Each structure stands twice: as structure tokens, then as C-alpha cells.
From Swiss-Prot:
CC annotations in GO: cytoplasm
Compartment(s) where it occurs, according to its Swiss-Prot or TrEMBL record: Cytoplasm
Example GO biological process: protein transport
Residue stretches making up the PPIase FKBP-type domain: 164-249
Protein name: Trigger factor
Length: 437
């Protein structure tokens, strides 16, 4: 098998060969002889089936295996010619040509490799920014939020239920005049305006008085988790027993112990310092995500030029196109089915954004190496576990699902990006002036 292989640029290569179908047939017969020693076919002793019987039973599978062996050899030999290793390949090689004619299979294959990315002088593109300032008012407001969070509920003297109040009430729901499972409770406590109940329920309780009974008409969302209720009209019969409010306490020693469980000697000064740092970190995260990171990304993508691995780029275009599919109208989708040129043209609209995304992936990876930023396996597992806890899922199953579906590299890249930008904008501040707001 004569092979031609050459680099089209530093990140891509094209290889070609002509495979005689006779060589595939030879490989099929070779595999059939090996298979005959292992399989059991009715009418023959184990391992004694003739090759003809094996070919009759397994010809399609043997042909596929033979072609795969030959194609693997094609890839291996192409890499030798190119002076590349298998672990340098990005994505799966793609056959751009496959023509079978007159006993010859004419094959062309595209391969992509990690590009050479030079990031010399990237520091000069880091945008200037002002360190966010935290005011006393913001600290006091955040402390009040914590105090409100742990404050006990007490019976209120209020006579009319308002937004922000806690209602203690009985309710029973009906769909088509029939009660449904899980639609009834007594002495239930709900913060009005919290959005914990289906749309319309909490608003329907506003203005109720103690011991008042009221029918509240609502509609279950179309995507409601209980399929038998999704999209259905319902009536809830409600009786209000009590209006409750939270009584905010003082920031005394006992409260500080609750709010600072890991602190040996909690104090108001330490808590305020902790809150101040938390607010500053939140402001900094917002500044990074909304302003600094997009600005930095645009600049380095524009200024650092390198060859793009075409296979990875095409995969990213496909991914972005698939993600956008649900936003297209029925008319557009119908037109795409009829007009392939329109489909191709629409897909190409995602090319520029895909180029930026792929370039950023390599730039982030290279800059992270330069700054010695890494994501450990423990950090990766912890991030997946925390996501599972947040959504009430089994963390071990969630991790296994991510591993099986190949999502872990995506999570790892997101963590690497977060760590990198936090590092960049904590060490390379070009303007130490504070933000006056």
C-alpha cells in the first residue's frame, strides 16, 4: 500500500492511498481463519468450523474488521511519514474522499494536530481595571441579609397578607374538580413573593385576612415535572391561619458563633472583614466576567495568529449550530430540510464565533501553562460533586455520567479558565486606583 502524506500547515495534514480490494479480501480470509478457531457454529465441533461456514455467518463483520485494520495501518504509516505521534492527533481523522472503482479504493484522509501557539507579550494586552471599592452601607446590608436568613419566625399583628410576609395556611388543589396527589397540606408556611409555588399562587394570596378562605385559579407550567399536571388549569382552596414575620436580632456573641462556625474567637470586626472580602470578591467576579475577560479575549484572539486544527473547528461549528437549532422557527427548519444550500449557509454563520472559541481554548491552555495554573483531579471531582449537591443529585452517579459522556474535559477547561482569569486579574492589576461608586 503506497501512502502519500503531507502537512498542509502546522496544524493539519492530508494523506492519501489506493487500497486494492484484493488486499481487503485477503485480510477477511485471514480473520476468518482466526475466527474459525474460536467460534461455535451449529453442526461443527467448537473451533472446527470451516472457513466457508465462518464467512457465510460473519462476512459483514469480518469485512468491517478488515477495513478497520487496514485504515488503522494507513493512519499509523501516515503519522510516521509526517513525523507525528498518535497522541498529537486532535479529534478523529476524517475521510474526505472514499471512492471504490475497478478493484481499487481511492482514499483521502484529513488529520489535525495541536497547533504551535506563541503567546509572547500577552501581558501587555491585559486591560486596566480599578479594584472594586466596598462601602460601609454595602457591608451593613449584607450583614442584615445574614441576620434575616437566621432570624426566627414570629406571629405578626398584621391583619392583611403582603409580599414578604410568611403565611401559615391550609390548601388543597383540584384539577378537573378532582384532588391530585401532593396537592394538599395543613399549616404550611410560605414566604409570599419567594416564587416557590407555581406562578399565580402567591399573588393570589395577597390581601388575604386571618381565617379567610379563598379559591385561587392557576395554570401548571407546560414543563411541570409531574406530566399529569403539566399545562393543566387548577383551583387551590386556601384558608389563611396566621401571618408571620421574621424578627431580626442583634449581631451579638451568640449570633456571631452561628455565623462564623469555624472561627475560634468570632468578633464583629472579623465578621465585617469577612463580609467585606466576600463583597469585593463578588464585585471582582462580576467585573471579570462582564468586562475584563471579554475585552482580554477579543484582544488576544485578534493579536495572536496560529494555524487552526480544521477538524476541531468544524466540530465546534457543528456544536454551536446544534445548540442554536432550538431557536430556529418551524419555517426555517422546514426550509433547511428542503434547501441544503440554505442549511450550509446558516451553519457558516457560526464559523467566526467558533474560530474565536477554539482559539481561546488553545490560548487559555498556553497562558495557563506559562503561569503554572493547573486543575487537579480533586478540584475536578469536587466541582462535579458540588454541582450534584446543588441540584439534589447523587454525586457519584453524576460524576460517572460526566465521565461516560465525555463531559469532564469541558468542566476541567471551565475550571482552568476561571482559575486563570482570577490569577491574571489579581496579580496584574495595571491601575491600583479604587472604583468610586
Amino acid at each position: 500500500m503506497e501512502i502519500s502524506a503531507k502537512l498542509t500547515n502546522s496544524a493539519n495534514a492530508l494523506a492519501s492511498t489506493k487500497i486494492p480490494t484484493a488486499s481487503i479480501n485477503e485480510k477477511v480470509n485471514e480473520l476468518a481463519k482466526q475466527t474459525a478457531k474460536k467460534v461455535r457454529i451449529d453442526g461443527f465441533r467448537p473451533g472446527k468450523a470451516p472457513v466457508a461456514a465462518v464467512l457465510k455467518r460473519y462476512k459483514k463483520e469480518l469485512e468491517d474488521d478488515a477495513k478497520n485494520d487496514i485504515f488503522r495501518n494507513f493512519v499509523d504509516e501516515s503519522l510516521k511519514i509526517l513525523g507525528k505521534e498518535k497522541n498529537e492527533i486532535l479529534g478523529e481523522p476524517i475521510f474526505s474522499k472514499y471512492e471504490e472503482k475497478d478493484g481499487i479504493i481511492d482514499v483521502e484522509m484529513k488529520m489535525s494536530f495541536r497547533p504551535e501557539v506563541k503567546i509572547d507579550g500577552y501581558e501587555k494586552f491585559i486591560p486596566e481595571f480599578a479594584t472594586p471599592r466596598v462601602t460601609k452601607k454595602e457591608i451593613d446590608e449584607k450583614i442584615n441579609e445574614f441576620l434575616l436568613m437566621i432570624a426566627p419566625l414570629e406571629k405578626s399583628d398584621k391583619e392583611v397578607l403582603e409580599k414578604g410576609d410568611f403565611a401559615k395556611f391550609d390548601f388543597e388543589g383540584f384539577v378537573d374538580d378532582k384532588p391530585f396527589d401532593g396537592g394538599k397540606a395543613q399549616d404550611y408556611v410560605l414566604e409570599i413573593g419567594s416564587g416557590r409555588f407555581i406562578p399565580g399562587f402567591e399573588d393570589g394570596m395577597l390581601g388575604m385576612k386571618i381565617d379567610e378562605e379563598r379559591d385561587i385559579k392557576v395554570k401548571f407550567p407546560e414543563n411541570y415535572q409531574a406530566e399529569n399536571l403539566a399545562g393543566k388549569d387548577a383551583i387551590f382552596k386556601v384558608k389563611l391561619h396566621e401571618i408571620q414575620c421574621k424578627k431580626i436580632g442583634e449581631l451579638d456573641d451568640e449570633t456571631l458563633k452561628r455565623l462564623m462556625p469555624g472561627e475560634k474567637e468570632p468578633s464583629k470586626e472579623k465578621f465585617e472583614a469577612q463580609i467585606k472580602e466576600q463583597i469585593r470578591a463578588d464585585k471582582m467576579a462580576k467585573l471579570i466576567n462582564e468586562e475584563l475577560k471579554p475585552k482580554f479575549a477579543d484582544i488576544i484572539v485578534e493579536n495572536f495568529i496560529f494555524d487552526m486544527p480544521e477538524i476541531i473547528l468544524e466540530q465546534e461549528i457543528d456544536l454551536q449550530f446544534r445548540n442554536a437549532w432550538g431557536t430556529f422557527s418551524k419555517e426555517e427548519i422546514e426550509n433547511f430540510r428542503k434547501d441544503k444550500d440554505a442549511l450550509t449557509k446558516k451553519r457558516d454563520e457560526f464559523r467566526d464565533e467558533a474560530v474565536k472559541s477554539v482559539k481561546m481554548t488553545f490560548l487559555i491552555d498556553e497562558i495557563a501553562k506559562d503561569r503554572k495554573i493547573q486543575v487537579s483531579d480533586q478540584e475536578l471531582v469536587s466541582a462535579v460533586y458540588m454541582e450534584a449537591y446543588r441540584y439534589g443529585m447523587d454525586p457519584k452517579k453524576h460524576l460517572e455520567e460526566y465521565r461516560t459522556n465525555g463531559y469532564l474535559p469541558v468542566v476541567k477547561m471551565a475550571l482552568l479558565e476561571e482559575k486563570l482569569f482570577n490569577d491574571i486579574f489579581s496579580k496584574d492589576k495595571k491601575s491600583e486606583k479604587t472604583e468610586e461608586k
